[in-house]
A protein has these predicted regions:
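Short, flexible segments with low predicted structural confidence
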Residues: 1-2, 111-112, 138-139
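Basic, ligand-binding patches in group-transfer machinery
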Residues: 102
Length: 193
């Protein structure tokens, strides 16, 4: 894989925009199904639908022509989602100030928020374990280089790649290699809230 053409923090920003675009896509699907729009459900539904569609397309090599446009569209949807979300949230920041002061006074809440913040910061770091480097990054890099699925004998555990690796391929295609890690940490934090 080629050297990054920009600072690694830009890759983290791209990953956050792709995740935001996935949330917006999931919210639109939920709206069409007349369901309540939850951030966690929208993120999960958007990730599964996008990844499953790309996984099916990858079996016939169609995915490799639509991968980059899909990643760019998700990034632009994420920028739109964040822009519209910030227009709603910023005026409410003054009312949140009192709630934040109450949370700071309770040590259990303060400790849990500190742990969540640390977990998010940890997800921004590069992966170091063999499973992430060999398998979760290896399959997306192999897909992008060879435009086909690797044989199962190439990987540490002989596992077949799934929709998680397809979603990581979206991130790796735009140099947002921490997309899967940030998705996992946000999901754990949203489940705990």
């Amino acid at each position: 894989m080629a050297a990054l053409p920009f600072h690694p923090l830009l890759g983290i920003l791209i990953a956050i925009l792709i995740l935001s675009g996935t949330i917006l896509f999931g919210q639109e699907v939920l709206k069409r199904l007349d369901q309540k729009k939850s951030v966690l459900v929208s993120l999960a539904l958007g990730m599964v639908l996008i990844s499953q569609a790309l996984y099916i397309c990858s079996l016939d090599k169609i995915m490799f022509t639509i991968l980059y446009p899909t990643a760019w569209c998700l990034m632009l949807l994420g920028a739109w989602y964040n822009f519209s979300y910030l227009r709603i949230v910023v005026p409410k920041c003054y009312t949140w100030r009192n709630g934040i002061l109450n949370i700071i006074q309770d040590p259990v809440y303060s400790f849990s928020i500190l742990l969540m913040f640390g977990f998010i910061l940890l997800s921004f770091s590069p992966p170091t374990n063999a499973d992430a480097l060999n398998y979760h990054w290896g399959i997306p890099v192999y897909l992008l280089r060879n435009h086909e699925w690797p044989s199962t004998g190439l990987w540490l555990h002989g596992s077949l790649g799934g929709i998680g690796e397809i979603y990581n391929t979206l991130g790796v295609s735009l140099y947002a290699e921490n997309l899967g890690t940030i998705l996992q940490s946000l999901s754990l934090i949203l489940f705990s809230c």
